[in-house]
């Protein structure tokens, strides 16, 4: 016998399906089903994953595309796609049902179902009286494409339900097909299905009642079992339906938008015209012969693969941004393209890096190139709305991002479903160190009190493992647009995003890549926003017009690089993390390409591939540089014989092992997926044999393969690093020459980067920039620059810093502020008329100029007499109550209301109060000997744990003289977990290490001192 499963829901039927689509097709193929239909509820979100699994494993099973719907909560149907027209119809129905409802739900109308002309309809009677009405209604509209689908789950009413369905089939002269109503690939997933149902109903599994599946019969079942449950003719009908379904997802063909081509041009001639025009702009001194040849090669390949429209689409988008004054920068593999450089998509001169066009486009890949373009994060919405306006909502939508269960959400949801107390779950979540790779979370939770021998404890661990990675809902991609020539909803369903004026498709970037469909990445980058704002401030206060291009055209500035070499890079793009800062004094960047290397080398890939130490030794002249051949030298000479970039690995495979460009790109993809599936192993024989055949010794070949494995999924492309290095240098240059403008721009672009406003302000003050507190008479919503008596510019903090105080209230306050300023809080109250806003400003001490202190301001805010019209214009003298806030109280309130304080540092106050032992301040560390024992204390402002094999965590402690870099090894973290994970004020006893002017402390003992400053509302940026 044979069978086709026609009704099967994956975990993209959120909180219902208990298996991945991949698991379902693998299990169905194992059972030798003829076909399987992935039919999630009003969704095709799981179908591409099933398709990709069948293709990858070459499974002998047919996939049918479909979806299940409820109409009026009474009529349940499954729509299947026998042909391409049926698929377009299904996508339209899903789109309509989703678009007329809130995100996460759908509303199917009778018209939607009546309009079906091509889809097959499986009707699943509900065993209610209304079945007779819906049977008649469906038979009237879909007589020749309608089946009664019978599910048998071996429940108590199975026989009665089957008889009911047979009577309905006879009544309406409809054929019957067997189907399973499958929710899981194996019976072992039943407990997880119960948990999902409990999460859906907001209760524990014990309280589900009749909502809980009574058995595991909604798993895929072997054929011999199905033959005992269903009549043979019903099973045969399932395969008959499957035979009629000829549509395959591989039939989908992407059609590029065509309206960008002016009259008189072909796509080829128009692209060439734009490139010719652009290369004169990019190379005003003349086109080098090798660049000219590269352009011709690229254009020929673009024409051969018919990617003209893709490049023209990206060019159109970036030209819109340029015309609107929106900063942008193309990055990633696009920087390997000289055509992209000529089209002004990317900013990296191809002569500055080693261009590898195969990284961008190759014949063997048979897929469109991937161009990432970053725009200012505050103005990206203008670009997004331009795309919607140009192509219409019918033809453009954002790709989806699948939001999945991760450790915290998995622990919380599974625990609640099993009836574990929320306080215990919070304790688990807070105290498990997920970055400890040598001790899994299971062992840590057992140490924290979970009973592993209990049934509930065993279920908890099993179910958390199973649900981790399950999709929770679809969100919008950070900027991946899909733009089509015709209606997009005929290619993939479109639904509402949570954000207003946004729509998303039901597929993510991996799905699009699997089907070789175009995605245009319109991404947001905070640093571009900060740079533009800095340019504006420089022009306003210094009448100097700057641009990224102008700064990068300047010769490498030794003053800027000296600042970088000292790791004075707080706020500088890409080189501000503790991992980067620890590397800067060792690598000592002195030119642009050094920055390219710096950005890439402080990554897990080069570290795990053991490439960092050899590179540094060779750079410092401590190790000779040698190459086994001229071909290898041509690839590795720029990085002193050590592979640092992805492109170098790809080129090595080509020149040393004989890989074609496409084969080398397949190697790159395998590297990207190395941690998931270990597919790199299949390349080892070809790589080793290819090198041996070309005269390289086995040791060299093995070392190259080991380095490739070390890169794993962390390899960093040179093209990516080159694009980032432009912004890194630009931001460092601005920090050195225009510090007040730089910090103001950064503060006005928050949230972004590694550092909080408090840390940025502390760094600004250390660089001699005066910072003024929020003031009712001098602040605007944004932070701005003011001329100080010493002739220098200072930063006036803005109302945006006050937690809970909105821009509308701030704007009203500034617009109506008298030229001489407010004279009394009562004037402000008449403008804001919102006691909460007044209290927020009082808490932030914004009224100090009027009231003397925040206590007086609060009294004035609570004074109801002055709210009466008769007393509006009475100017009372500044109150001088005896109760004055202490310096400590002011500090606590500063942090609570604005997240920072301009008064004395918490560490200073704690020391004066006698709450701290003797310790060494950051500024005193330079006086200490290398390898000496020190004790440091500071407020924890950051914990960073790069994905390196060493298991290091970099702590940043802030004392009253600066930031202290602390290195915590895995063993130390594990032995002192509480202080490691939760402390706000931390004492560290350890060994001082110094490299030039840069110091860090290797932690030995961690002591939590938070109790000394328990009320402090400081926040650290942890593990980002």
Swiss-Prot record:
The keyword DNA repair applies. Keywords: Cytoplasm, DNA damage, DNA repair, DNA replication, DNA-directed DNA polymerase, Nucleotidyltransferase, Transferase. This is Error-prone DNA polymerase. It is an enzyme of class 2 (transferase). HAMAP family: DNApol_error_prone. DNA polymerase involved in damage-induced mutagenesis and translesion synthesis (TLS). It is not the major replicative DNA polymerase. GO terms for biological process: DNA repair; DNA replication. Gene3D superfamilies: 1.10.150.870, Metal-dependent hydrolases (3.20.20.140), Nucleic acid-binding proteins (2.40.50.140). GO terms for molecular function: 3'-5' exonuclease activity; DNA-directed DNA polymerase activity; nucleic acid binding. SMART domains: POLIIIAc. The keyword Transferase applies. PANTHER family: DNA POLYMERASE III SUBUNIT ALPHA, ERROR-PRONE DNA POLYMERASE. The gene is dnaE2. Signal peptide: none annotated. It holds the Pfam family PHP.
């Amino acid at each position: 016998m044979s069978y086709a499963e026609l009704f099967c829901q994956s975990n993209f039927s959120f909180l219902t399906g208990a298996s991945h689509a991949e698991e379902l097709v693998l299990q169905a193929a194992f059972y030798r089903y003829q076909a399987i239909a992935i039919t999630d509820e009003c969704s095709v979100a799981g179908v591409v994953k099933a398709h990709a699994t069948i293709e990858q494993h070459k499974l002998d099973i047919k996939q049918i595309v479909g979806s299940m719907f409820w109409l009026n909560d009474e009529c349940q149907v499954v729509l299947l796609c026998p042909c391409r027209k049926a698929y377009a119809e299904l996508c339209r129905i899903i789109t309509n049902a989703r678009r007329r409802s809130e995100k996460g739900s759908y509303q199917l109308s009778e018209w939607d179902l009546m309009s079906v002309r091509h889809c097959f309809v499986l009707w699943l009677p509900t065993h209610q009286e209304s079945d007779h009405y819906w049977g008649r209604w469906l038979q009237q509209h879909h007589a020749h494409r309608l089946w009664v689908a019978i599910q048998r789950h071996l429940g108590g009413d199975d026989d009665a339900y089957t008889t009911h369905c047979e009577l309905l089939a006879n009544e309406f002269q409809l054929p019957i097909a067997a189907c399973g109503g499958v929710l899981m690939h194996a019976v072992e997933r039943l407990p997880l299905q119960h948990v999902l149902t409990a999460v859906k109903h907001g209760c524990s599994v014990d309280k589900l009642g009749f909502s809980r599946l009574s058995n595991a019969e909604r798993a895929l079942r072997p054929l011999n079992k199905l033959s005992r449950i269903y009549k043979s003719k019903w099973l045969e009908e399932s395969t008959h339906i499957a035979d009629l379904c000829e549509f395959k997802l591989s039939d989908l063909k992407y059609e590029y938008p065509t309206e960008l081509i002016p009259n008189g041009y072909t796509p080829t001639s128009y692209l060439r015209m734009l490139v010719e025009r652009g290369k004169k702009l990019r190379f005003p001194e003349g086109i080098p012969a090798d660049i000219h040849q590269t352009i011709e090669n690229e254009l020929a390949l673009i024409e051969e693969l018919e990617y003209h429209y893709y490049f023209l689409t990206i060019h159109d988008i970036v030209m819109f941004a340029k015309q609107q004054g929106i900063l942008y920068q193309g990055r990633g593999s696009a920087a390997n393209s000289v055509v992209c450089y000529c089209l002004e998509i990317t900013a990296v001169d191809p002569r500055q890096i080693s261009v590898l066009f195969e990284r961008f486009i190759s014949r063997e890949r048979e897929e469109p190139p991937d161009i990432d373009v970053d725009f200012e994060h505050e103005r990206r919405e203008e670009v997004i709305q331009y795309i919607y306006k140009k192509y219409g909502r019918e033809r453009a939508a954002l790709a989806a991002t699948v939001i999945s269960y991760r450790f915290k959400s998995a622990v919380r949801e599974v625990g609640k479903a099993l009836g574990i107390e929320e306080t215990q779950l919070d304790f688990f979540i807070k105290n498990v160190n997920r970055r400890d790779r040598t001790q899994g979370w299971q062992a840590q939770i057992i140490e924290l009190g979970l009973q592993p021998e209990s049934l509930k404890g065993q279920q908890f661990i099993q179910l958390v493992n199973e649900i981790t990675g399950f999709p929770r809902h679809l969100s919008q991609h950070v900027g991946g647009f899909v733009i089509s020539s015709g209606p997009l909803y005929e290619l993939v369903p479109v639904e509402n995003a949570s954000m207003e004026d946004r729509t998303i498709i039901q597929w993510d970037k991996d799905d699009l890549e699997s089907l070789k469909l175009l995605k245009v990445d319109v991404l947001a980058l905070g640093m571009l926003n900060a740079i533009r704002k800095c340019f504006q401030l420089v022009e306003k206060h210094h009448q100097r017009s700057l641009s990224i291009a102008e700064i990068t055209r300047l010769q490498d500035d030794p003053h800027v690089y000296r600042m970088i070499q000292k790791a004075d890079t707080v706020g500088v793009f890409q080189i501000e993390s503790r991992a980067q800062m620890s590397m800067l004094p060792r690598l000592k960047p002195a030119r642009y390409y050094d920055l390219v290397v710096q950005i890439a080398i402080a990554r897990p890939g080069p570290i795990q591939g053991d490439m960092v130490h050899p590179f540094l030794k060779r750079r410092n002249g401590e190790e000779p540089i040698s190459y086994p051949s001229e071909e290898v030298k041509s690839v590795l000479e720029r990085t002193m014989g050590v592979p640092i970039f992805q492109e170098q690995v790809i080129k090595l495979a080509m020149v040393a092992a004989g890989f074609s460009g496409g084969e080398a790109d397949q190697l790159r993809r395998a590297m990207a997926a190395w941690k998931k599936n270990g597919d790199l192993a299949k390349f080892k024989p070809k790589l080793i044999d290819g090198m041996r055949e070309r005269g390289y010794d086995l040791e060299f070949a093995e070392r190259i393969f080991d380095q490739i494995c070390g890169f794993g999924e962390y390899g960093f492309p040179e093209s990516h690093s080159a694009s980032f290095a432009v912004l890194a240098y630009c931001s460092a240059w601005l920090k050195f020459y225009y510090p007040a403008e730089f910090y103001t721009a950064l503060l006005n672009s928050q949230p972004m980067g590694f550092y909080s406003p408090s840390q940025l302000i502390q760094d600004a003050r250390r660089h001699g920039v005066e910072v003024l507190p929020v003031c009712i008479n001098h602040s605007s919503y944004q932070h701005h620059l003011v001329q100080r008596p010493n002739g220098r510019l200072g930063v006036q903090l803005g109302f945006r810093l006050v937690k809970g105080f909105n821009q509308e209230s701030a704007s009203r306050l500034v617009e109506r502020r008298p030229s001489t300023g407010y004279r009394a809080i009562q004037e402000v109250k008449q403008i804001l008329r919102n006691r909460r806003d007044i209290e927020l400003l009082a808490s932030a001490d914004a009224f100090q100029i009027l009231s003397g202190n925040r206590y007086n301001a609060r009294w004035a805010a609570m004074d109801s007499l002055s709210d009466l019209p008769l007393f509006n214009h009475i100017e009372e003298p500044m109150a001088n109550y005896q109760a004055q806030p202490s310096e400590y109280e002011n500090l606590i309130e500063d942090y609570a209301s604005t997240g920072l304080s301009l008064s004395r540092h918490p560490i200073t106050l704690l020391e004066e109060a006698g709450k701290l032992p003797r310790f060494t301040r950051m500024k005193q560390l330079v006086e200490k000997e290398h390898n000496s024992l020190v004790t440091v204390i500071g407020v924890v402002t950051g914990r960073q744990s790069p994905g390196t094999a060493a298991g290091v965590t970099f702590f940043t402690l802030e004392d009253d003289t600066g930031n202290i870099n602390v290195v915590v090894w895995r063993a130390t973290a594990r032995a002192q977990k509480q202080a490691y994970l939760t402390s706000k004020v931390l004492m560290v006893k350890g060994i001082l290490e110094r490299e030039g002017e840069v110091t860090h402390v290797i932690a030995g003992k961690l002591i939590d001192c938070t109790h000394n400053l328990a009320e402090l509302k400081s926040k650290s940026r942890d593990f980002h």
